[in-house]
Amino acid sequence: MGRRRAPGGGSLGRVLIRQQTQRSRSHRHTDSWLHTSELNDGYDWGRLNLQSVTEQSSLEDFLATAELAGTEFVAEKLNIKFVPPEARTGLLSFEESQRIKKLHEENRQFLCIPRRPNWDRKTSPEELKQAEKDNFLKWRRQLVRLEEEQKLILTPFERNLDFWRQLWRVIERSDIVVQIVDARNPLLFRCEDLECYVKEIDAAKENVILINKADLLTAEQRFAWAVHFEKEGVKVIFWSALAETDHLNGDLKEEVDSVAGDTNKTESESSSLDANEIPHRDLISLSEESASDSGDSKYEDCQEDEEEDWQTCSEEDSVPEEEEGCNADSETQNRKNAENQQVNNDSYLVSKQELLELFKKLHTGKKVKDGQLTVGLVGYPNVGKSSTINTIMGNKKVSVSATPGHTKHFQTLYVEPGLCLCDCPGLVMPSFVSTKAEMICNGILPIDQMRDHVPPVSLVCQNIPRRVLEVTYGINIIKPREDEDPYRPPTSEELLTAYGCMRGFMTAHGQPDQPRSARYILKDYVGGKLLYCHPPPGKDPVAFQHQHQQLLESKVKGGELRLQPGKGRKAKQIENVVDKTFFHQENVRALTKGVQAVMGYKPGHGLVTAAAASAENVPGKPWKKHGNRNKKEKSRRLYKHLDV
């Protein structure tokens, strides 16, 4: 055994020394919370202990800049600004949207695409690449200057020069340049400067706008867009790659083969194709059937006349195009104006064979490659360029994906001898938008990569009525409070909460998973399940949405909106905490003293019903004093929850 240590404080000295050492070490390596002031009245011995600063946070950078400028900060009081609830949605008010639209119209001429510099056979590849880089850098600086000076928001345009080189090659080798746009918002996906650039390269080239996904539009909506582009002198063709693919794979293939064999069909047969040949998507099938009864008869004569004018126009313009060729700029402009006056657009959905025949009739002049008509397909990502090629070819020649920007290189495919299709990679061209939420809802930005889900879902709630959302998903969205507008659109939180509870999307804490629900709803909006079609300029956006009312009417006729007796008759409403507390039964209570009930009230129990009173009066144990419970409880303890 070891030597016994002395009881008591034998190690007290060591403990004190150890604590003092630890205290000195802690003060040496940690900062103190003591307030000090730098007087700068002595010699700075730490002037040589410099630290290199290469990166700073935004706050540190701001404070360092303010210190260098000698700026002093003074607290401002009584500078109160009320932030409305709509500010968190990320959407613009009506006044702000009108102001931004005015700025868009004033600066529309600055929206351009990069040009390829002039070159000839004497230009070396190195000189051409350097000239392309210089022009591209100049173009990017111009757009950045436009954003900074005018405070405008541009779409995230393509910043890779190799993609623009693909576009230049497609335009140079194409006789017809087809811009494919989305039928729900054609003006956003249309690039007017691209049409000018095509004419700058060769005046004999033709510009055409192919409105894809046109099966989402009704006959009246297609007619409105046809008239709008006809006034601007732009040739448009209404087309649906998905609907045509379903048609070719369906039971009506024999009818399509007969149409392909007979190219000289009458106008009545071409108009009947619009109503009977194209199978529409699930959401639009009911609305198209009701719209065809009321609208197709109204536009039959117009469509027949427009088809005759289209064929006459293309045949008459072929002769002067062959004779004139590439003339001076003044003659080109005069010829272009003459063509614009004779443009007539049809509003019916064309089939595959009709689309190819229109391509052959549009360009009859001198071709880039003798004996071959080359059609270049350009446009934004995910608008259906590759799907259009696969539909025309009859099988999968180009890979297709729902993610924007899937096609990386242009490729040429021969449909038949003398007709070649050229698929260009999707390019996001510079365009004006009000918010980033519009780019997400229009499919320009990927939904899975969004950071904030509130602005795009709020935009969906503004465009799609409350009743359509409830019918589409089978949910009940909570109603506004009594002091709010009963017709206001639902907020993003109300929609996502109802959708998440219905689908069972919950977080770890038992709350509805709103970001996950937002991705599903936004994908339905981009895919067309939640349909909103932008109208032409000058049209009322609310009156232009024919599908919403037709969808509700079809659901009512089908019996899907019938409510079960005693269920779903009254939707939930946002509770007002003040009203609920004020009118609660606990607040209405008589304060009495004594054991026996007075006028139906007992101390600590409130109102006593007749059934309860009769049960207590049963002579079982009369010696029990049940009324002494909470007899001496003070009122301020009973009603402490009412104290402020």
UniProtKB/Swiss-Prot annotation:
Domain of life of the organism encoding this protein: Eukaryota
Catalytic activity: GTP + H2O = GDP + phosphate + H(+)
Chain positions found as Phosphoserine: 93, 97
Cellular location(s): Cytoplasm; Endoplasmic reticulum; Nucleus, Cajal body
Protein name in UniProt: Large subunit GTPase 1 homolog
The protein's enzyme class: hydrolase
PANTHER family reported for this sequence: LARGE SUBUNIT GTPASE 1 HOMOLOG, LARGE SUBUNIT GTPASE 1 HOMOLOG-RELATED
Example of a GO MF term: GTPase activity
Sequence similarity: Belongs to the TRAFAC class YlqF/YawG GTPase family. LSG1 subfamily.
Organism expressing this protein natively: Mus musculus
Entry's transmembrane regions: none
Bias (Basic residues): 622-644
